[in-house]
Amino acid sequence: LLIDNKEIKDVRLDLVFVSQEVDLFDLSVRDNLCLGKEIPDKKIFELLEEAGLKGWYNELPNGLDTIVGERGIKLSTGQKQRLNLIRGILIDKELYFFDEPTSNLDILSEEKITNMIEKYLKDKTYVIVTHRQKLKSLCNKHYIFENHEMREELSETSILN
């Protein structure tokens, strides 16, 4: 596997990992999303709306300062997944690795997340591990991995089947 024409094992990876298992810190929504970076609230609101979380956000008692996590407001798995994607976008690296990023989302939410990946990461490199057809459509190369090894590259025809 090559990144910028170098073997992946020889490249120091500066990447964002967006997992299907989301851990939120016992911190505010803002702190969970920004991880210490100064991000304008306007940008955060834009991403929350695009991810379909505007209604949820509007009901938070303290807005972006509302504490979430084990000691705060409890979130559904789907809400956590969408916040995790927003966090990944805000981290802003060149390489992204997604592990089933829409596994707990309904079709409408998956569509929103797919649109966000397409919009915000269009000039980035990303790898998506998924079984979902919609996410597969974002990728220009498709591989089957079996027993921890890359078995084959798939053609567009076999992806659709």
Regions found by a protein language model. Give the residues of each.
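Conserved catalytic loops of ABC-family nucleotide-binding domains
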Residues: 118-130, 136
